[in-house]
């Protein structure tokens, strides 16, 4: 594992290290929020199970509303101000959840929080890509997942302790850590846009910088390969999200786990990612995209099969373990492929489009998953098996096509594209 890390942390680009820190903060906040939100909504807030997914949908809905307007804003105003504003905005939204009462106000807060979050993760990845060479992107994106997962260990663990007092208090912890992350970015982060742009890239910047509007901010409408890639990402992530969204209800209704036990379960899943992600990247570097996505699909299918068989403790542990392995396989694969497709002047826009596709799981995943669960407790797992099988094949094929140059006449861009995705053949 040591060989996978940069040879010297002191020599590593400072913005990339700060990006890892912000991923940790965001992972902590998500880890503190996600496992406990359904439990808080159904117990303390008195919200019907079938409506919990709609509140999740408000969070992701804010991202979808904001993406066409501000999805590529970091390409125009810079990475630094976007990271500061978005981290403070998301943190303030989580803090507000501690104080609000009522479904309507909660929905408004989640909508506003989602709007701020729409640019947080993609801009972090963009800043990392700005200051690291394409050949190092897979490892840095894997480190980003490790940092996020480290936060997701402490988040549920902290949430499990706070849940003993009040489920609402987990929002306070998640919001505080993100606000602190935003303050650190304000004092320590330098602007990264323009770093790593070769002289030959200026001709790409000139035409694209003049484009405005929806087509410039959502490149999926202009890049057919990216659109196909994002479609399969959405399908795969939505189905995979059912484990995170439905397992807390499934385990509690079966009497298997308490709210604190749910937090411990997801903390374990995050710890597994921290321990194995940098080892899995060795496998990622020597296997084809189709091999990796099929492996992730098989792991998710087996997790669904275990959950459909029984809500016992061992099956819950096995299911979240398999889900973590699946995410380790495809997690670094997707941003690397998207970054390879992106023109330098639209890197943040492409990352934002990818992030929106992934974040659809936070609306469609819980909405569909909890609706299926309301019909029958095992229905999400049974329905998810064929869906994941199809999505894993489609995603592997789409990522494989991403390694072919999209602009063969642009000699300067082609080598960069090929090298960035070469590790994922």
Model-derived features: positions:
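Juxtamembrane intracellular "pre-TM" segments in multi-pass secondary transporters
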Residues: 1-13, 190-230, 416-424
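Core transmembrane helices of Major Facilitator Superfamily
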Residues: 30, 112-124, 323-334
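Short amphipathic helix-loop junctions that connect adjacent transmembrane helices
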Residues: 36-50, 245-261
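Residue-level signature of mid-helix packing/kink "hotspots" within the transmembrane helices
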Residues: 60-68, 152-153, 270-278, 362-363
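Helix-to-loop junctions at the C-terminal end of transmembrane segments
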Residues: 66-78, 276-289, 373
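Structural signature of the two symmetry-related core transmembrane helices
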Residues: 81-95, 291-305
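Cytoplasmic helix-loop-helix junction between adjacent transmembrane helices
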Residues: 110-150
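A late C-terminal transmembrane helix in Major Facilitator Superfamily
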Residues: 346-374
